[in-house]
Amino acid sequence: NLFNPAAGGLLFVTLCWPQLVFAYPATFTNPEVFGEVTARTTNSIAYVLSVGSVPSTDMTSVMLGLHPGPMGTLNGLVLLACMLYLAARGSIRLWQPLITLGVVAVFAAFFPRAAYSSLASMYYEIFGTAALFGTIFMLSEPVTGATREEGRLLSSIVAGLLLVGYNYFGAYQQGILFVLLLMNIINHHID
Protein backbone atom coordinates (compact mmCIF):
# COMPACT_ATOMS: atom_id res chain seq x y z
CA ASN A 1 0.00 0.00 0.00
CA LEU A 2 1.24 3.44 -0.83
CA PHE A 3 -0.96 4.96 1.88
CA ASN A 4 -2.49 3.61 5.05
CA PRO A 5 -6.14 3.05 3.99
CA ALA A 6 -7.59 3.92 7.41
CA ALA A 7 -5.68 7.21 7.49
CA GLY A 8 -6.77 8.03 3.94
CA GLY A 9 -10.43 7.48 4.84
CA LEU A 10 -10.18 9.54 8.00
CA LEU A 11 -8.43 12.32 6.09
CA PHE A 12 -11.29 12.43 3.59
CA VAL A 13 -13.91 12.64 6.35
CA THR A 14 -11.83 15.23 8.25
CA LEU A 15 -11.50 17.50 5.24
CA CYS A 16 -15.20 17.20 4.32
CA TRP A 17 -16.81 17.45 7.77
CA PRO A 18 -14.30 18.74 10.35
CA GLN A 19 -17.00 20.17 12.60
CA LEU A 20 -18.51 16.68 12.96
CA VAL A 21 -15.27 14.73 13.18
CA PHE A 22 -13.92 16.81 16.06
CA ALA A 23 -17.15 17.12 18.10
CA TYR A 24 -17.00 14.64 20.97
CA PRO A 25 -19.73 13.75 23.46
CA ALA A 26 -19.00 14.98 26.95
CA THR A 27 -17.62 12.30 29.25
CA PHE A 28 -20.26 10.05 30.87
CA THR A 29 -23.10 11.20 28.59
CA ASN A 30 -25.28 8.86 26.56
CA PRO A 31 -25.65 10.29 23.05
CA GLU A 32 -28.63 9.21 20.97
CA VAL A 33 -28.01 6.58 18.31
CA PHE A 34 -31.03 7.43 16.16
CA GLY A 35 -32.95 10.64 15.60
CA GLU A 36 -31.92 14.14 16.53
CA VAL A 37 -28.73 14.32 18.56
CA THR A 38 -29.16 16.44 21.67
CA ALA A 39 -26.14 15.27 23.66
CA ARG A 40 -23.74 17.99 24.76
CA THR A 41 -20.46 17.93 22.85
CA THR A 42 -17.14 19.23 24.05
CA ASN A 43 -13.60 19.77 22.83
CA SER A 44 -10.74 17.34 23.15
CA ILE A 45 -7.45 17.99 24.93
CA ALA A 46 -5.83 18.25 21.49
CA TYR A 47 -8.09 21.21 20.71
CA VAL A 48 -7.46 22.84 24.08
CA LEU A 49 -3.70 22.56 23.48
CA SER A 50 -4.02 23.87 19.91
CA VAL A 51 -5.56 27.13 21.13
CA GLY A 52 -2.90 27.57 23.82
CA SER A 53 -5.09 26.80 26.81
CA VAL A 54 -4.38 24.60 29.80
CA PRO A 55 -6.41 21.35 29.87
CA SER A 56 -8.74 21.09 32.85
CA THR A 57 -8.59 17.28 32.88
CA ASP A 58 -6.38 15.83 35.61
CA MET A 59 -3.51 13.53 34.65
CA THR A 60 -5.09 10.37 36.07
CA SER A 61 -8.20 10.87 33.96
CA VAL A 62 -5.99 11.48 30.93
CA MET A 63 -4.09 8.23 31.50
CA LEU A 64 -7.36 6.31 31.90
CA GLY A 65 -8.95 7.91 28.83
CA LEU A 66 -11.71 9.64 30.80
CA HIS A 67 -11.82 12.71 28.59
CA PRO A 68 -13.35 13.59 25.22
CA GLY A 69 -11.51 12.63 22.07
CA PRO A 70 -11.30 10.03 19.29
CA MET A 71 -12.62 6.67 20.46
CA GLY A 72 -9.90 4.10 21.04
CA THR A 73 -7.01 6.53 20.98
CA LEU A 74 -7.08 7.91 24.49
CA ASN A 75 -6.68 5.18 27.12
CA GLY A 76 -2.96 5.49 27.78
CA LEU A 77 -2.67 2.40 29.96
CA VAL A 78 -4.30 0.16 27.37
CA LEU A 79 -2.22 1.67 24.57
CA LEU A 80 1.02 1.16 26.51
CA ALA A 81 0.04 -2.46 27.20
CA CYS A 82 -0.70 -2.93 23.48
CA MET A 83 2.68 -1.46 22.58
CA LEU A 84 4.49 -3.87 24.91
CA TYR A 85 2.45 -6.81 23.60
CA LEU A 86 3.16 -5.95 19.95
CA ALA A 87 6.85 -5.52 20.73
CA ALA A 88 6.98 -8.85 22.59
CA ARG A 89 5.36 -10.60 19.62
CA GLY A 90 7.82 -8.97 17.23
CA SER A 91 5.10 -7.12 15.32
CA ILE A 92 6.72 -3.74 15.98
CA ARG A 93 10.10 -2.60 17.17
CA LEU A 94 9.64 -0.95 20.55
CA TRP A 95 12.21 1.73 19.84
CA GLN A 96 10.28 3.13 16.86
CA PRO A 97 7.31 4.60 18.74
CA LEU A 98 9.55 5.49 21.68
CA ILE A 99 11.85 7.58 19.47
CA THR A 100 8.92 9.40 17.84
CA LEU A 101 7.28 10.05 21.21
CA GLY A 102 10.65 11.05 22.65
CA VAL A 103 11.03 13.77 20.01
CA VAL A 104 7.51 15.00 20.81
CA ALA A 105 8.27 14.92 24.56
CA VAL A 106 11.52 16.89 24.21
CA PHE A 107 9.85 19.64 22.20
CA ALA A 108 6.85 19.68 24.55
CA ALA A 109 9.18 20.06 27.54
CA PHE A 110 11.15 22.95 26.08
CA PHE A 111 8.34 24.64 24.15
CA PRO A 112 5.00 24.02 25.93
CA ARG A 113 1.92 25.25 24.09
CA ALA A 114 0.40 26.71 27.26
CA ALA A 115 1.55 28.01 30.64
CA TYR A 116 2.16 24.82 32.60
CA SER A 117 5.15 22.72 33.65
CA SER A 118 7.40 20.84 31.24
CA LEU A 119 6.30 17.51 32.69
CA ALA A 120 2.61 18.35 32.28
CA SER A 121 3.27 19.54 28.74
CA MET A 122 4.95 16.25 27.79
CA TYR A 123 2.19 14.27 29.45
CA TYR A 124 -0.68 16.08 27.72
CA GLU A 125 1.03 16.02 24.31
CA ILE A 126 1.55 12.25 24.45
CA PHE A 127 -1.45 10.96 26.39
CA GLY A 128 -4.04 13.69 25.69
CA THR A 129 -3.80 13.50 21.91
CA ALA A 130 -3.85 10.62 19.43
CA ALA A 131 -0.02 10.64 19.22
CA LEU A 132 0.42 7.48 21.28
CA PHE A 133 -2.16 5.56 19.23
CA GLY A 134 -0.73 6.74 15.92
CA THR A 135 2.88 5.96 16.73
CA ILE A 136 2.09 2.47 18.03
CA PHE A 137 -0.40 1.23 15.46
CA MET A 138 0.17 3.29 12.33
CA LEU A 139 3.69 4.71 12.14
CA SER A 140 5.26 1.44 13.32
CA GLU A 141 3.42 -0.90 10.97
CA PRO A 142 5.69 -2.60 8.42
CA VAL A 143 3.59 -2.34 5.23
CA THR A 144 3.89 1.42 4.63
CA GLY A 145 6.95 2.00 6.82
CA ALA A 146 10.65 2.02 6.03
CA THR A 147 12.23 -1.41 5.65
CA ARG A 148 15.89 -0.91 6.64
CA GLU A 149 16.90 -0.27 10.26
CA GLU A 150 18.56 3.06 9.39
CA GLY A 151 15.45 4.05 7.48
CA ARG A 152 13.23 3.18 10.44
CA LEU A 153 15.39 5.27 12.76
CA LEU A 154 15.33 8.26 10.41
CA SER A 155 11.61 7.76 9.81
CA SER A 156 10.89 7.79 13.56
CA ILE A 157 12.84 11.02 14.07
CA VAL A 158 11.28 12.74 11.07
CA ALA A 159 7.79 11.64 12.15
CA GLY A 160 8.38 13.13 15.61
CA LEU A 161 9.55 16.43 14.12
CA LEU A 162 6.61 16.58 11.70
CA LEU A 163 4.17 15.77 14.49
CA VAL A 164 5.54 18.57 16.66
CA GLY A 165 5.38 20.97 13.72
CA TYR A 166 1.83 20.03 12.84
CA ASN A 167 0.61 20.09 16.43
CA TYR A 168 2.01 23.58 16.91
CA PHE A 169 1.11 25.09 13.53
CA GLY A 170 -1.50 22.82 11.90
CA ALA A 171 -5.13 23.58 11.18
CA TYR A 172 -6.68 20.40 12.62
CA GLN A 173 -6.55 18.87 16.09
CA GLN A 174 -5.15 15.44 15.33
CA GLY A 175 -1.84 16.04 13.59
CA ILE A 176 -0.87 12.37 13.67
CA LEU A 177 -3.17 11.66 10.71
CA PHE A 178 -1.42 14.13 8.43
CA VAL A 179 2.01 13.08 9.67
CA LEU A 180 1.19 9.45 8.95
CA LEU A 181 0.22 10.15 5.36
CA LEU A 182 3.30 12.32 4.83
CA MET A 183 5.49 9.60 6.28
CA ASN A 184 3.91 7.05 3.93
CA ILE A 185 5.29 9.14 1.06
CA ILE A 186 8.63 9.95 2.71
CA ASN A 187 9.31 6.33 3.71
CA HIS A 188 9.47 5.26 0.07
CA HIS A 189 12.26 7.79 -0.46
CA ILE A 190 14.10 6.97 2.77
CA ASP A 191 14.68 3.37 1.64
Model regions and ranges:
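Loop-to-transmembrane alpha-helix initiation sites
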Residues: L2-A6, M122-A131, R152-L154, G170-M183
